Amino acid sequence: IGEKVGTGSGPKVDVALDPLEGTTICATGGPNSLAVIAMAEEGGFLNSPDVYMDKIAIGDGLPPELIDIDDSPDKNLSRLAAAKKCEIEDLMVLILDRPRHAELIAKVRETKARVQLMQDGDVAGIIATTRLNRSVDMYIGTGGAPEGVLAAAALRCIGGQMMGRLVFRNDDERDRAAGMGIEDLNRKYSLYDLAN
């Protein structure tokens, strides 16, 4: 993060990459591990520290600003169901299978939406909400912030909506973020804030 590469001549660009997103998936022969690289004009990606990020994402072809990371799963799923002209119980929500998501999983299940748990790989999880794979309607959960930027870059290419917020577990992480130019530690990031 923040590493300078290249010869110094030519256009300046931001490069975001993860040589193996879903390491455990790959090691165990599971699906959806990815090698991911994205490029934008200088300043085009959120320069995020290696911390967690709360994320919510949906696919393309839907009314703008349909999701809000500050709203409950019930509100977000109600709006999504209305936009898709279906019932909430027809929706599939993908969530990383982590102890930290126990309350979130319970709240989504209370809405009667279906929950699919994944072991790893939230970039692939967010891409699964797009037209390329209509089996997932929404992705919600907390995962790595750099993966959030990569997922946002993918959605900018394929289409979709996403919001994120950095999550800090301690003062060291907050200080690191401030040192990287993050001024509002509670800021809600839109898709275009993450990857423009």
Regions found by a protein language model. Name each.
Residues 40-68:
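Flexible glycine-/small-residue-enriched beta->alpha junction loops
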Residues 1-40:
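Flexible, acidic active-site loops/lids enriched in D/E/S/T/G that coordinate Mg2+ and/or position polar
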Residues 71-196:
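An extended, acidic
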Residues 24, 63-65, 139:
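A short glycine/serine-rich beta->alpha loop
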Residues 10, 30, 39, 58-63, ...:
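Short capping/connector residues at structural and topological boundaries
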Residues 3-9, 60-66, 109-111, 167-174:
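A generic short-segment signal for beta-strand/edge and adjacent turn/coil regions
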